[in-house]
Amino acid sequence: MERTFIMVKPDGVQRGLVGEIISRFEKRGFKLVGLKLMQISRELAETHYGEHKGKPFFEGLLNFITSGPVVAMVWEGKEVIATAREMMGATNPLKAQPGTIRGTYGIDVGRNVIHGSDSPESAAREIALFFKEEELLSYEKTLDTWIYE
C-alpha cells in the first residue's frame, strides 16, 4: 500500500480543524499509521521546505510553520497520494474547489491549513524527515476487505 505525509499546519491546529481533517481521511477509507503533535524547529522547516529556498515567500513560510504546533501524520491506502491531493484542493484556497479541505477552511495561500506530499518521492522524503521507522505502525484494519478489491 502507498503512504503519504500529511501535516495540519499551525493555522489548522489553532482553529481546531485537526479532528475534522482526520475524520475526512478515515471516512475516505485511509489508514492512519503515524501521528505526532509537534513544534517544528527552524532546521526541520528549512529542510522540509528546501525546494523553496531563495523564493520571496521562503522566510515568511518558515516563520509561519514554526509559529505554533502542527500535527504530522502518515496515511496509508490505495492511491493515497493522489487522492489526498484532491481532498486538500488547490494550494491557493481561492482556487480550491468547494468541499475540499482548503476550499472549505483555507483563508489564503499562506494560511491554507494543510500540507500533503505531491509524489511518492516527496512522500518518502517527508515521512523520513518527520518519523522514525519504529514510529510507523503496520496493522490490519477489519474494514480493508470492504474498501479494497
Curated annotation (Swiss-Prot):
Keywords: ATP-binding, Cytoplasm, Kinase, Magnesium, Metal-binding, Nucleotide metabolism, Nucleotide-binding, Phosphoprotein, Transferase. Its cofactor is Mg(2+). GO terms for cellular component: cytoplasm. The keyword ATP-binding applies. It comes from the Bacteria. It is an enzyme of class 2 (transferase). SUPFAM superfamilies: Nucleoside diphosphate kinase, NDK (SSF54919). Its EC number is 2.7.4.6. Homotetramer. This is Nucleoside diphosphate kinase. It comes from Carboxydothermus hydrogenoformans (strain ATCC BAA-161 / DSM 6008 / Z-2901).
